[in-house]
Amino acid sequence: EMCIRDRGMNFVVSYQTTRPADTRIHLYDVGCSYRLGGWFFEAEYLRKEYARNSFAGVNAFDGFFCYDLPLRRVFKKMSFAGRYDYMSDHSNGIPDDNGLLFVNDLERHRVTAGITFSFGLPFMADIRLNYEMYFYDKGVVPKVSEHDKIVLEFMAHF
């Protein structure tokens, strides 16, 4: 991983490899983030290649923005966030009974909007409420967990 930081801007380029079964998978990643006052922006592109052309390469993109509004009472800040992410058809690298890789995760687009309330010390925790909207090609039947939904999370930082 290579990281360059300058005046609120952060660039990251990385490479990873994994071999969940018989096929080596290479992941190439480039990302950029920028902080300006209470605003934070981030974009990332990932390319996933499977050895021996055993599965079509995967493209993934993520764009994110957030605005932090300082608070003075129970919560330290309230953050408003939006995100867009995309991933083309994807395989986890584990072959079927015929030894071939197959689509485990269908191509999708997702838009997320949410609000987070952050506690200050001594708790270091967040309460987040998001709405996630998924977009698929016609005729695609997504997994139960990947339909439009409202998500409420409680996160503790250690």
Which residues are covered by each model-predicted region?
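Short, small-residue-biased leader/transition segments that mark boundaries at the very start
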Residues: M2-I4
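Outer-membrane beta-barrel pore domains
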Residues: G8-F158
